[in-house]
């Protein structure tokens, strides 16, 4: 990034911060702060061990310095501006989840498609946190990172004192890591008629049970019934390992029988297991993959982590780190709603071919002098794909 581009970006960020609505963390004086400056680029120098006593101090700093990236600690400290972590004296920490395209398997290459994919993972995480951990919507602060994903902030008193290992256990649960399906899908003894041997029955948690068992049951039966309702259902089931035409026909019959489906929902999987003993295991594994959420474990486990400040700008995109309610998250379009700069034309020198979709426009930019809307020009400059001016 050349000097002219640095000055331009810093001036635009400064202009933004003069009127920006910044969402400051609770217990502001107990937070450590860190920033990355345009002045230091291309070097990445985190200037941390800062603290602010009031909202006014934060606003003055942002307006005066216009940093490229702004972070604050998830932790609360007695002395947040002390030069070493030991001297800061850790008190507690918010519970943070980071969902980023870099850590989500199968994320598309297209920026817009990638962000849609990450949002779906984020909403899955919300379901797990509310249904299985009992958090309420108001306990969870959702934030678009300004780049490639979303953060969840939880400041519930019950989680503030959790150690790193305990936070990693939460990640293990929501990712389905280490989930032992053999302990969920069990054989249960059933008394036979007088004089007969005791029989066994394949039992799974009912769809109304809590935790992974009920979650898997509901997802698995819904998926099976969706397949069974199709005209070519039998053909679809022959696509499973070791299921021939006869077996597929019997499976479809079971899934179209409401009495049998009610038994399946209650956890009695005997009808399906008799037809094909592997199908429940296969489908349960599929459900875990579909229902689990991929989060960045080191972020959640780090009780001294710095996290982006909501309302600040992301120095690699020029977009706003945006606070959202869960209802807002569902309809949120970051490539429109997180853009804060104008449409006025800006001349720039593109140094590598670039393509991005912003504000509903597909922008394909070739090398050389170009004129783009301000928001797109800033995005390219922040990405290192262009320099300011002709």
Swiss-Prot record:
The job of this chain, per UniProt, is described as: Catalytic subunit of DNA primase, an RNA polymerase that catalyzes the synthesis of short RNA molecules used as primers for DNA polymerase during DNA replication. The small subunit contains the primase catalytic core and has DNA synthesis activity on its own. Binding to the large subunit stabilizes and modulates the activity, increasing the rate of DNA synthesis while decreasing the length of the DNA fragments, and conferring RNA synthesis capability. The DNA polymerase activity may enable DNA primase to also catalyze primer extension after primer synthesis. May also play a role in DNA repair.
Tell me which cofactor or cofactors this protein depends on: Mg(2+); Mn(2+)
Q: Cross-referenced HAMAP family, in alphabetical order?
A: DNA_primase_sml_arc (MF_00700)
Listed under GO biological process in this entry are:
DNA replication, synthesis of primer
State the name under which the record lists this protein.
Answer: DNA primase small subunit PriS
What is the annotated quaternary arrangement, including any partners? Heterodimer of a small subunit (PriS) and a large subunit (PriL).
What the entry lists under Pfam families is as follows: DNA_primase_S
Q: Note the SUPFAM superfamilies from the entry.
A: Prim-pol domain
E.C. no: 2.7.7.-
Species annotation: Methanococcoides burtonii (strain DSM 6242 / NBRC 107633 / OCM 468 / ACE-M)
The Swiss-Prot or TrEMBL record describes its family as follows: Belongs to the eukaryotic-type primase small subunit family.
| Enzyme superclass (EC) | transferase
What positions does UniProt annotate as the active site of this protein? 98, 100, 296
Keyword check for Nucleotidyltransferase, yes or no: yes
Any one Gene Ontology MF annotation carried by this entry is:
metal ion binding
Q: Name one GO cellular component term.
A: DNA-directed RNA polymerase complex
The lineage's top-level taxon is: Archaea
Q: Which UniProt keywords apply?
A: DNA replication, DNA-directed RNA polymerase, Magnesium, Manganese, Metal-binding, Nucleotidyltransferase, Primosome, Transcription, Transferase
């Amino acid at each position: 990034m050349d000097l002219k581009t640095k000055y331009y970006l810093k001036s635009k960020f400064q202009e933004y911060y003069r009127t920006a609505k910044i969402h400051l963390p609770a217990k502001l004086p107990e937070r450590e702060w860190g920033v990355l400056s345009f002045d230091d680029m291309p070097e990445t120098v985190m200037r941390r061990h800062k603290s602010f006593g009031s909202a006014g101090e934060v606003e003055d700093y942002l307006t005066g310095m216009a940093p490229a990236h702004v972070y604050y600690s998830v932790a609360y400290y007695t002395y947040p501006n002390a030069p070493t972590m030991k001297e800061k004296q850790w008190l507690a920490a918010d519970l943070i989840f980071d969902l980023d395209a870099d850590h989500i398997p199968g994320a598309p290459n297209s920026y817009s498609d990638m962000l849609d994919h990450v949002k779906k993972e984020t909403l899955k995480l919300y379901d797990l946190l509310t249904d299985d951990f009992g958090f309420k919507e108001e306990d969870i602060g959702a934030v678009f990172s300004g780049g490639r994903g979303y953060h969840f902030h939880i400041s519930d008193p019950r989680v503030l004192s959790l150690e790193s290992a305990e936070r990693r256990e939460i990640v293990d649960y929501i990712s389905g890591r280490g989930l032992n399906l053999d302990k969920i899908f069990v054989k249960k003894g059933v008394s036979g008629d007088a004089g007969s041997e005791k029989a066994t029955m394949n039992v799974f948690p009912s769809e109304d049970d809590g935790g992974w068992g009920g979650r898997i049951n509901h997802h698995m039966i819904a998926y099976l019934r969706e397949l069974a309702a199709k005209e070519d259902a039998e053909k679809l089931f022959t696509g499973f390992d070791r299921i021939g035409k006869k077996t597929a026909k019997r499976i479809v019959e079971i899934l179209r029988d409401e009495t049998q489906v009610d038994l399946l929902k209650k956890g009695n999987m005997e009808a399906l297991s008799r037809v094909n003993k592997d199908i429940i295991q296969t489908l349960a594994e599929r459900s875990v993959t579909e229902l689990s959420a991929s989060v960045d474990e080191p972020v959640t486990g780090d009780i001294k982590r710095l996290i982006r400040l909501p309302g600040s700008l992301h120095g690699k995109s020029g977009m706003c780190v945006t606070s959202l309610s869960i209802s807002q998250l569902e309809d949120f379009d970051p490539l429109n709603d997180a853009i804060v700069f104008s449409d006025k034309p800006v001349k720039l020198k593109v140094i590598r071919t670039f393509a991005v979709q912003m504000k509903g426009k597909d922008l394909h930019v070739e090398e050389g002098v170009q004129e783009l809307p301000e928001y797109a020009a800033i995005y390219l400059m922040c990405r290192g794909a262009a320099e300011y001016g002709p």
